[in-house]
Each structure stands twice: as structure tokens, then as C-alpha cells.
Amino acid sequence: KQRNRGQDGAGVGVVRFEHGRGEPYLARARRAGPGNLDQLLAVISEGMDQVNDLSDAELDGAKRHSVAPFLGEVMLGHLRYGTHGGHSEDHCHPLYRRGDRRSRSLMLAGNFNMTNASALFDQLLRYGLDPIGESDTQIVLEKISHFLEVENRLIEHACGEGSLQNLSGRALASEIENQIDLVRVLEKASTMWDGGWLFGGLLGHGDAFLCRDARGIRPGFVLERESFEAAASERAALATVFNAPMDEIVELTPGEVLEIKRSGAIRREAYTPQQPPTRCTFERIYFSRGNDPDIHRERLELGERLAPQVLERLGDDVHNAVFSFVPNTAETAAEGLARAATKLVRQQHADQLWNDVSGGTAKREQLDALVEPTIRVERLAHKDQRMRTFIASDATRRDLVLHVYDVTRDLVPPGSTLVMLDDSIVRGTTLRESIVAILDRLEPARILFVSSAPQIRYPDCYGIDMSQLGRFVAFRAAVSLLDEHGKSDLLEEVEVACREQLASDPHAPVNHVSKIYGAFDDAIISQRIATLLTPPTAKCKVEVLYQSVADLQATMPEHTGTWY
């Protein structure tokens, strides 16, 4: 149910409480590339149809694992959207670090970005470790594993040979498993972490945890029932899978860890100092599932807030306009836009009709034009594939967008204005390479693309990472304008200032890149974006209208992560 969160790859890990001699207690499967989720589901479903033939005794013992290897007691799943690194199976979560005991074995998955991976790597070196690879995922795995090892040694020292309990062998291993404190482990491991994250982890003996960054940048939700505990990045997914009421699913408080012991004991506790919340807004605009009622209401309102600007841009041409949306995730905001625009136009018509009646100038032939619905809504663009091009890998995105859209013909009279609501216009690749070209075949006079998100001007290194500034269409538009106005020297000035800042206080950063945008007002940049989105073969005029940051903040005041 969360396949919307990533399509580069998928993985599942499971803990098996009962296992035969020499058999693995942790099982893992990962797949990458096209069809990865279907392939993964086939792997983990292996043998499930034979489970019904087992006796109760066999179900309670290790026999079920030989029949169905992924039938376990604790499971961890992940869908990969790779912001950095590769897209192979080796990069898919969960990652696994095997220890010589179950309590030292860790499986980890997460939605996250660490902004200081290099500093964290240096910290591991100071611990005397020799980590292999410098990816932020590997570094986090190594750091948690290190302090998990420390925790094991502390308990062994307190309970092992020579202590008052003087335990050894299996008795000592069991006591270590009982006493492991994952809150304490994560308190130590998370020192110096800087980023946004939601991590889930499994230990080989069956303990599990879920931890969230202190600013709440990445979302996390928990459903607790008498017989199980479940957690996910999205509330709507939990509600659908377990048929649970929305009010039964609670947010994992930012800065908290949910610890689930093998015994079933549950603890939620802070593990890192609290910070002012900055929940990511782009999660709500684009990434999350739209069937969450709160997200549905927010997306409707984002569309509604754009209606006055859209009608102002259309002017007298509103009767010649057709409203639609692209991609599918923009449908709810488009509905909000159409509703609000219809309401405003009807109010204008009612005022005009009242004035005509009051002044005695009303004529019968005017009434039809004033009372008939004015805002026309059609589904014009259709995706041939259920793929989200924004989260496709760079290598495949261009080929993908060329063929992913088609249009409904004979709905739009030639010379019309198309109002296309998009949830966000970030790189502009899909619009330029596919959507504008295919909509142009309908012979409109102009296409007005309306973005429910503001201009994306900066990398969001803490949230949904869009890590290469030079690919943003807003940045390319600003650079194009600087070049046109003979101000290209500003780019070098900003680069020098940014490089100097690398050696300064990291806790007092200055956004020097804002000077590039500050040379022009938002409307001028939007006009240049429209130019960049227009392919050479297009015959229609292309225009762009963006949501304001103020209206975005008013729509979702509890989500203050606006880096736009």
C-alpha cells in the first residue's frame, strides 16, 4: 500500500522466533528494477498456500519456516526511492549486519537523509572502527551496530561469569536479550545525527524499534492492537491494511523511539533532544497517499487558494477554458481549484444579474449565459503506465516521460485555453518532454500550468531530497535571466560565498543562493520557466502559475518544513 513512496526497489526482513538447528533466525529478500515489488511478493509468499495443511503443533514449531521461510513473528519492509547512490539490489533496504549472537544481529531500513555523513564517518574512525563504504545508510547501520555491541558487552559484564548472577552460555545469551535497552542504544547512536529520518530495525532475537527525527521531518504512524503492533510512514496505509479507524492510528512523536520487546512489552520514549517541529510539506503535497483525510483536505484547499489567481489570469477567456490535471496525484487539488473557481464565477454572475434586474436592464437572452455552469472540467491527460516519473531514477526518467502520457481527443475545441493543475513543477522534465507536446496536439491557443506547490528553488536535504540544484527548472530560469541581463558574474560571487561558508560555523548558515533569485521577482521567473518548458515544436503558448509560500503555510500550519 506504500508503493507510492518508491519504485527503485523493495525489500523485506523477518525474524523467526522458532528455528531449527543451524537454520537462520533472520530472513531477508530484496529486489530492484522494474517489477521489483511483484517479484518480492512472490518470494515472500512462497509456501504460504501449504501452511493450511500443517497441524497446530507444526504451526507452533519450526516446521512452518521450512515450508514458508517468510512466515515469522516480526517483519520489516521498505520501498526504495534512491536520492543518492545506486539503484541495484545491494542498495535496497533492509540492510543486515550479522553478529555472532542473535542480540548482536541488526536489520535496518529507513526513509531518511543525513546531511553530515562525512562527519559521522570520521566519528566511526575515532571509535576505532573500519567501516566499508561512506553512504549515509551504511554509516547509520555501523553506528547503531557499534552501540548495540556496546550494550551487549555492558550486560554481559553485569550478568556474566564473575558477576553476582554468574551466567554463561545460553542462559547469559537469553538474559542479554531480555535486558537490551534499545532506547539507550539509540540515545548513544544518534549523537551528531543531522537530517530527517524514520528508521525501523529488527534484532535477531525479535526486539524491534521505530525512531523518528526530533523535528518530525519524516512521517511515522503507529497502530496498537491487543495482538500486534504495526507502524508505517503513512496513516492511510495502516488504516487500509488493518481496516482501522483513523483516530486509532497515532503519530509517533518527533524525537521518540517505539521499542517493542520480543515479550510483547512496548515502550515509547524520547531518545534525542527535542527540536522545533518542521514537518516536511512536500510529503503532504506530493509524496503521501491522497486517501488520508487530512491530506485530502489540504490538497483540496491548495487548489481552492489558487482559484482567484487563475481567474485573474484567464480574464474574459474563462468561458473558453477547460480545467484538468496532471499527474494523477494532482486530481484532488484540481477538484478544489474547479470548485472554488466555479463558486467565484457564479458569484460574479449573481452580482451581474442582480445589478441588471435592479437597474431594469435584464434581458431574457442574458439569463442562459449567466446561470449555466461556466467552469468546464475534463480528464485530458492519461498515464499509460502507473509510474511516478519524479521518483524514477535519472537514467530512466527521460525515456520514461516520452511515452508515459496520452490524451483524450475531440473534447477540446481548437483555440481553447487548457488549465492544467500539477501538484509540483520541480525539474520540468515530464512537462517539457511529454505533457506539453501531447497536449499541443489538441490545438489549444494556450496552456496554463498551475502548480499547487511554490517554486522549488533549493535542495531539500532534510526531507524529500532533490539534491542537484542545477536541475531545478526555477534555478535554470534564474540563471537564464541573469545571463540575459548581463549579471552572470553573480553566479561566481555566490559560489565563492558558498565555498567560504563550508569552513565557517555550520550552526549559523547563510543562504547565499537566494541572491540568484532575488535579482528578479517571482512572476518574471515564472515567465522564464514557461519558456523553458515549451518545446521547439509547440504551437501553443505556455504559461505557468505557482502557489505562494504564504498560502501553502496557511493551508498546513502544522507543517512548517518549507524550504522553497
Language-model region placement:
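Conserved short alpha-helical segments that host acidic/polar catalytic motifs at enzyme active sites
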Residues: 1-253, 259-322, 326-327
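Extended, hydrophobic alpha-helical segments in both membrane/secreted and soluble proteins
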Residues: 323, 330-337, 341, 377, ...
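Terminal amphipathic helices with adjacent charged low-complexity linkers/tails
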Residues: 264-279, 325-362
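Hydrophobic alpha-helical segments characteristic of transmembrane helices
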Residues: 148-152, 307-308, 314-346, 364, ...
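Cofactor-binding active-site loop characterized by glycine-rich and histidine/acidic residues
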Residues: 34-87, 335, 340-346, 357-409
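Active-site proximal loops enriched in glycine and acidic residues that flank catalytic Cys/His/Asp
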Residues: 201, 212, 233-235, 262, ...
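Phosphate/ATP-binding catalytic cores across multiple sugar-kinase/actin-like superfamilies
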Residues: 192-195, 298-319, 332, 337-340, ...
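PRPP-dependent phosphoribosyltransferase catalytic core
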Residues: 190, 205-207, 212, 219, ...
